[in-house]
Amino acid sequence: MTDTGCPAQSVDLRIYWGVAGHAAPNSHHRRGITLNRITIELETGRVSGRVASGFEPVAAAFADNFARHREVGAACSLYHRGRPVVDIWGGFADAEATRPWEQDTIALVFSAAKGPTATCIHQLVEAGRLDVDLPVAHYWPEFGCNGKEEITTRMVLSHQAGLAAVDGVLSLDQVLAWDPVVSAIAAQAPNWVPGSKHGYHARSFGWILGELIRRISGDSAGQYLNKHICAPLGLRYWVGLPPQMVSECATLLPPEGGSNAVAELLGADSLTARVMSGPNGLFGYNDMWNRADVLEAEMPSSNGVGDARSLARFYAAVIDEVDGVRLLGPAQLARACEEQVRGADAVIFHETCFGLGYALQPALAPGAGPRCFGHPGAGGALAFADPDAGIGFAYVMNAMQFNPEGDPRSRTLVKAVYDCLATA
């Protein structure tokens, strides 16, 4: 287990529940479902929120993470059949335990951003504005050189494009400015023969897809996302955090050794190290992700910022209508979730499975349904939909942990969710 530098907490068993079915001050009605207020006292701090009857074990599991898995601050949300049934948060938004994690605290979710970004692409496909089997160069002519002429959007979405590592010498300011990094990608040669294997495109995924969104729609990826997904659903989620929201973001607590562990193990010139720290070794899992300029830039695969409530609502609206909004039609969603690749990943080595932009089971969310799709984020974040169970789930946190067997915090929450669904 990774040490975050914060002591484990014990859970005070004084759990205060609202009374189901009564519109008292401690309950909240939502389209026929009563969400009961809950408070769970921790050794320091508390868990707060609202939970529908029958889903109380999710809140208990969430609180247990503070005692058993060194949670610092986090939030978890669950939609079931288009309606919220769990909305909880707790702990602290900083390492010093001076900022309680509040209802409106937002957090960096790293690669959990890939799900919303992929959904932007699928909206363009569904509208007839993008064909995933045409070369990327059809929309972005400068891209079609140095062995990339036949790379398709399908290859990019399924991590087969061979552009996992970005070549070129770039400063951080250039990367954050967008144009220099996408120009570098357009000029480079692939890392492997496109389509011959798959390997995780940790950051280039978002730059390539974001440039496609810009060239087709005229909006940056963050602008398109806000206009067509976040605003219609009232989501507090951004790629390119507005400056006035930076103060509401939880402080990321990096894991020990997170910055250079891959390079030290495999060598700085290894493909894996180049992907995970690139471009040009600029990125590590360290305090740089708390910088305002990094949060305010657009990195559509890496720096989504939002709350669990919004990500759960987002996935609920991908699979079904939520308050009159559905993000993708059934036919497009089915195509998006068709398995494209499965097997040993050329970048991160263990088995991965991808549809068109979405991570798929079994690696996505162990213990969840077989047709789940979504995306995890580095250090623990997880957001996904299960169309069979009719759920949108999200968990966000600030204390990064890397565990080769999977994050025990999200695993505990997912198990509690499905146990509740089984008895509903």
Language model: regions and residue ranges:
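Active-site helix/loop module of the DD-peptidase/beta-lactamase fold
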Residues: 103, 108-112, 124-168, 186-187, ...
